[in-house]
From Swiss-Prot:
Its EC number is 3.5.1.88. This is Peptide deformylase. It is an enzyme of class 3 (hydrolase). Its cofactor is Fe(2+). Fe cation binds at C92, H134, H138. InterPro entries: Peptide_deformylase (IPR023635), Peptide_deformylase_sf (IPR036821). The active site is at E135. CDD domains: Pep_deformylase. Pfam families: Pep_deformylase. Keywords: Hydrolase, Iron, Metal-binding, Protein biosynthesis. It comes from Alcanivorax borkumensis (strain ATCC 700651 / DSM 11573 / NCIMB 13689 / SK2). Binds 1 Fe(2+) ion. One of its GO terms (molecular function) is metal ion binding. Belongs to the polypeptide deformylase family.
């Protein structure tokens, strides 16, 4: 396994819309393993392929504290199950050190393929619903900072650009 570089806001590659995965094979499973290694090392609870500059519809997540519940979503489709909205404070490996409250549908259904290409469906609420919606935004070229005011987004962008300049 190999740790991958995580793109950071405002990198324009984060705005790329991901294409569907056409074939689930050993090459894709290696990418999945590398993404889990990268996510755990960061540390984080979710990572979309877009964040590691691979523009396919692939998400890895693990909400457990001891990293024993890995979830893979290939070509995920999401359906809100309620009109109710739930606010959660979100962070992102591509926007390190910043957290903002984002309101999203409280319950959703996800249809996707697993790491072996088998179709599955899961209903989610609370943190799982928030996380999958956050990661699916990445596949559409969106970031959680797109949900905050332009002023806040510009402030975050300037702070991250300053950090990148200082790091050389």
């Amino acid at each position: 396994m190999a740790k991958l570089e995580i793109l950071e806001f405002p990198d324009p590659r984060l705005r790329t819309v991901a294409k569907p995965v056409e074939k689930v094979d050993d090459e894709l499973r290696k990418l999945i393993d590398d993404m889990f290694e990268t996510m755990y090392a960061a540390p984080g609870i979710g990572l979309a392929a877009t964040q590691v500059d691979v523009h396919i519809q692939l998400i890895v997540m693990d909400l457990s504290e001891d990293h024993n519940k890995p979830m893979v979503f290939i070509n995920p489709q999401i359906t809100p199950l309620t009109e109710e909205q739930a606010p959660y404070e979100e962070g992102c490996l591509s926007v390190p050190g910043f957290y903002e409250k984002v309101t999203r549908p409280a319950r959703v259904r996800i249809n996707a393929l697993d790491r072996d290409g088998n179709a599955f469906e899961v209903e989610a609420d609370e943190l799982l619903a928030t996380c999958i919606q956050h990661e699916m935004d990445h596949l559409d070229g969106k970031l959680f900072v797109d949900y905050v005011s332009r002023l806040k987004r510009d402030r975050i962008k300037k702070k991250l650009e300053k950090i990148h300049r200082q790091q050389g």
